[in-house]
Amino acid sequence: LKASANTWNYTSGMRSYSPVYYGLEQYDVFTGEYSLYNLTPNTVPYLGDVTGGRDGNTQIYFEARLNWDKTWGKHTVSLMTVGIRDEKILTNGQGGTIYYTLPERNLGNSGRFSYDFDKRYFAEFAYGYNGSEKFIGDKQFGFFPSFGGGWITSNEAFWGDGLKNIISLLKFKVTYGKVGNDAIAGREGRFFYLSRIVDGGGEYQWGKIFSGTYSGFTFDRYANPDISWEVSTKYNLGVELGIFKDEALKLQVDFFKDLRENIYMERENFPQTAGFQRSIHGNVGKVTSKGFEASLDYKHSFNRDLWLTARANFTYSTNKFLEKDEKNFRDEYLKSVGQPVNQTWGYLAERLFVDQLEIDNSPRQEFGQYMRGDIKYLDVNGDGVVNTNDRVPMGYPTVPEIQYGFGLSGGYKNFDLSFFFQGNARVSFYIAPEAIAPFINRRNAPEIVARDSWSETHPDVHAFWPRLATYQVSNNVQQSSWWLREGSFVRLKTLELGYTIPKVDRLKMSNARIYFSGENLFSISAFKLWDPEMGGNGLAYPINRRFNIGLQLNF
C-alpha cells in the first residue's frame, strides 16, 4: 500500500486606510466658533479590505499493489495488479472557474500476468481499466489490454557452445496492445457532457430596425456526451542480437505501427447553416504511424589500461491522417487526409516581380499591396487569383522523421574521453520574415539581408530578401517556398576529457580527477544562416554553448 498527500496554499490580503482631511471654511475670532469642509469627500474613514492573491495546489494519491511469483521446475509465473486513486486540485491562480477549483479525479486498475518456460519461451498479458471524470456513462471507463511473446533462440539446445561464442544472444519478440488517452482539450476541456454558458458575451438586437443591442447569455461550448477516450493500437516486432562473449556487441531493432483512433479535434466540415456560435469538436480523427528504431552497443576491455564503449541509435518514423473532419475542399492538394500530421502548406514562390507591367499581367495576389521587388506567387488552380486555395503541401514535416545519435567513451591508463553526437533529418522549417525584418521596432538588418536584398541598384529577382520597407509588407511574409528551408543537422552535443590522479597518501585522498567538458560545441548543417535548431527566428536567443573545467576529489 502507498498513500501520499501534498498540499500548498497561498493567500494574501491587504488592508488600507485613507484619512479624512478638513479645511477651515469659517472662523469667528470673537466667539471662537468655526466650520470645516471636507477636503476628501470620497474617503472612507475606516479600514478598507483589498483583495489579494490566492493560489493553491493539493494532491491526494492512493495505490494498492499485489505481487505474486512462483517458480517450479522450468516454469515461472508472475502476477501483479495495481489499483490507484488520484485526486488533485491545481488552481494556478485561476480561482474564478470550476475547471481549476474542482478536483481532478482518476481511478484505475492495471495488471500483468507473465510466464516463461525454461528461459526460452515467454508470454505476457497486461491490461488497464481506467476511469476518467471527463466522460460520462459507459464511456467513463475504458479497458485497454495488451499481449506479448518472446523466444530466446540462443537458449535452445541446438544452439551449441561454438555458435554461442559468436552469437551469444538471439531473441525475437512481438507485442500488441491498446492504450487510452484522456488528456485531451486541456484543463478547460473537462466535463465534455456539460455546456458552458457565459454571461455578457452575446449581443442581442431589438427593435424594428435592430438598432439596439443588449448583452446576455451565450454558449462558450456545447455539451457532447459522446466524447470518449482516444485509443491507440500498437504493434511491435523486434529482435535482439548479442555478438561475442557477454554480448560485447548488442544490436536491437524494433519495427512498430501505431493506429490512433477517436482523436479529439474540431469538426471543420460542420454546416454553418446550423447556426452555432462556437466550433464543434468530437472524436473524429484517425492517424497511423509506422517506422523502426535501432540501437547498437559495444563494450570491451582490451587490457587493464585500455577500455572502450560505444553506442548508436537511430529512429525513423512517419505518420499520416487517415480520417479528419475537414472542409470539403475542391482541390485534393488542400486536404490533410493522406498527409503527415505536421505537414505544412504554403504558396509556391516563383521569384520577385520585375516591374509594374509584369504585375498588371499576372494573377492578382490577395495579400495586401505589392509592387516590383515583392514576391510573385504561382496561381496553382489557375483561377486568376492567388489566395488560400493556392496553398500546397511542401517540404518535410516540422517534426523530424529521422533522429539519431552516436557516441564513444574510452580510457587509457589515467586518461578518459567521451563524446556524443545528436542529429535529425527529413525536417523542414520556415524562416520567419516578420521576426527578422529590418527597420521595424528599431531592428537592425541581419547580415544576409544587408548583403543580399532587392533594391533599385540591385534588382536581383532571386535575392534572399525582397524589397526593403520600414513597415511589414504583408505580401512578403506569407508562408511560402521562398522561406522554406531544410532543417537537418548533426551536433556535437557533449564532449568530456579527463585525467585521474592516483592515490595521494599524504593528503589522505583516494583519487582526484580533473576534467574539461563542453556542450553544443558545433553543428553541421546545409542551413548556414544560424543554428537550425532555433527554427525560423534567427534573432531569438541562441542555443547555449558551454565550457566547464572541474576538479573532483575523493577522500
Predicted features along the sequence, with ranges:
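C-terminal beta-signal and terminal closure region of outer-membrane beta-barrel proteins
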Residues: 281-289, 332-359, 453, 458-464, ...
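Solvent-exposed loop/turn elements at secondary-structure boundaries
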Residues: 92, 160-231, 235, 248-250, ...
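Conserved small-residue
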Residues: 282, 299-398, 456-458
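Transmembrane beta-strands of outer-membrane beta-barrel pores
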Residues: 3-11, 83-91, 129-133, 153-155, ...
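Surface-exposed, low-complexity loop segments enriched in small/polar and acidic residues
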Residues: 1-63, 67, 76-78, 83-104, ...
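Outer-membrane beta-barrel signature, preferentially recognizing the C-terminal barrel domain
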Residues: 102, 153, 199-250, 279-303, ...
